[in-house]
Amino acid sequence: MKNIFLIPVLFLFLFTSCETEPGVSEAFAKYKHQNGVTSITVPGWAIRLAARWGDLDRNERELLQSIDKVKILAIEDKDLNARSNLHKEFYSAVRENSEMEELMVVRDGNDQVTIFGIADEKSIKELLILVGGDDNAMVYVKGRLKPELISRFMDENPQKGFLSFKN
């Protein structure tokens, strides 16, 4: 009897834990298995483990501990990149079918970058960076990011920048 009750609860948990924003899940489903595409998903437990054991200062550690999931999709193949525009392809799906609001838009020549987010008065719960044009990428961050923590991190690390892979 316990198994009959446990199985539906387990499936419900799995389906809700895998849920992501419209546009994000579509992009990953379409591109993650294609050659020339880098797809990275980092779960919260791995991020918190890195925060605990990494050689980080207090602000870096606190920032990492506030992140529950990171998903990155980048098109690196030149031919596929020339035929694709992630911004054009998924902008409408995110804008129309999501709770996310546009936080910032940058257009420079052929490149388009839009940052979407879901926030309350205390934190940013979800952040989506959508890049299309000459370069195509999508970065999705879910967690409880405090704006003052991001600001402090950027002030203390101006050479690195936020969400930068520079050393």
Residue ranges and their predicted role:
Residues 24-90:
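Early exported N-terminus immediately downstream of N-terminal targeting peptides
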Residues 93-119, 163-167:
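Short Gly/Thr-rich strand-loop-strand
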